[in-house]
Amino acid sequence: MRDYEVQPQHVTPEVQAWVRAQAALGHTAPTILKALRKSGWLADVAREVMAETLQAPSGVPVPRPAIGAALRLDAGDRQVDVLMQMSQPHIVVFGNLLSDDECDALMQAARPRLSRSLTVAVKTGGEELNDDRTSRGMFFTRGENELVSRIEARIARLLDWPLENGEGLQVLQYLPGAEYKPHHDYFDPAEPGTASILERGGQRVGTLILYLGEPEAGGATVFPDIGLEVVPQRGHAVFFSYDQPDASTLTLHGGAPVLAGEKWVATKWLREHEFT
């Protein structure tokens, strides 16, 4: 059998012109990315094409951990492992962010306060039930107790983002069958309720999902636009940022259905400015 050498792929003016043409026709960044992958472009090269061709100059500053080539980061009171990172979209998977005792303490404190999870009501700026989200959850106020304060300070140092720009820590419980269908965390400027939401700290620019309890099966955090699934591992976390409220950030994500056992997570959303 003859061995064939795999030819390297490079970003060319021709493929960039094609991407610009597709964007001009109104196709979204996720749709263009999927078309590149379907036509044979490798995932990392396709993302590079998108990043170089559809740069968005209107983006705002976002949390961005100073990782470089480091395998672990100093988060103040804890050394946190860097397990995976990518640049487009900006995603980092952290290990050892929380101890087992901290995971247990958060779940124990949250359990008696759980209720059916709500989502932002985009028409009014309030909250509402949404069939896309079937978890139970609660919010700690920022700095509510020593445990929450300690974890929030660790997150602020790890992500190099002001502590006061974070929303309160949310804890969620997913029972078998529970899920959160793919969505974006930023607030859509086209919705009538967004203006009032932004008064409390501006746009969301980053999300950190911390895994407190592992299910027996299912429950991955999925990023459909880039074909990534992050398996929930106790004490680990996944972080991603988005510099504009647009699908071109490729941060569409969701929580796959839990097939067996329970999944517990804590979510920290980060705003442009101080969250009040």
PLM features per residue range, with description:
Residues 1-239, 243-276:
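Fe(II)/2-oxoglutarate oxygenase catalytic core
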